[in-house]
Amino acid sequence: MAIYNLDDLLDKYSAEFLVLDFNHLFISSTIREEVWLLQRKKDSPLINKILQAAREFNIHEASVDRDLETYSGGQKAILACLLTLALIVDRKIHGLKLLLNNVLDSVSDENRSKLLQEFKEICSTHDIRLFTEKNGQIREIM
């Protein structure tokens, strides 16, 4: 059974994992605000990295001030993953256990493969472990 209540999801997994949940991908309304909340730098170079990566996923209309709610569900999932990947590299994070809850299921097969390749590169250099949750079971995928 999938967990759809954020409180239940965090109660169950947040002590062990960084949780990226499809139903709660962002806490602000634009990429610029999201990056500012995470880095507290105006117009961080991280923004350009995210937008460039978004173009590689054919999200050509991505912009720093576009309301995140105007993207499709799959586009939001991709942007959240790209933001997470960029932060891992930027902050030199190692040893993280990342739980993608209903995130990979929301993107096309092609984009899922591309995202997993991006994660694979980061996982190998930053000792990151990647997990998914399905039917109440955690499965390590990388």
Where do the PLM segments sit?
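Conserved ATPase "switch" residues in P-loop NTPase domains
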Residues: 120-124
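GG-anchored amphipathic helix commonly corresponding to the ABC/SMC/Rad50 NBD signature/C-loop
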Residues: 74-99
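Conserved hydrophobic alpha-helix in the ABC-type ATPase nucleotide-binding domain
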Residues: 111-119
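ABC ATPase nucleotide-binding domain signature region
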Residues: 1-40, 135-142
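Walker B catalytic motif
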Residues: 67, 95-111
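Loop/turn-to-beta-strand initiation segments
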Residues: 94-97, 125-131
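Conserved ABC ATPase "signature" region
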Residues: 47-63
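Conserved ABC ATPase signature
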Residues: 67-75
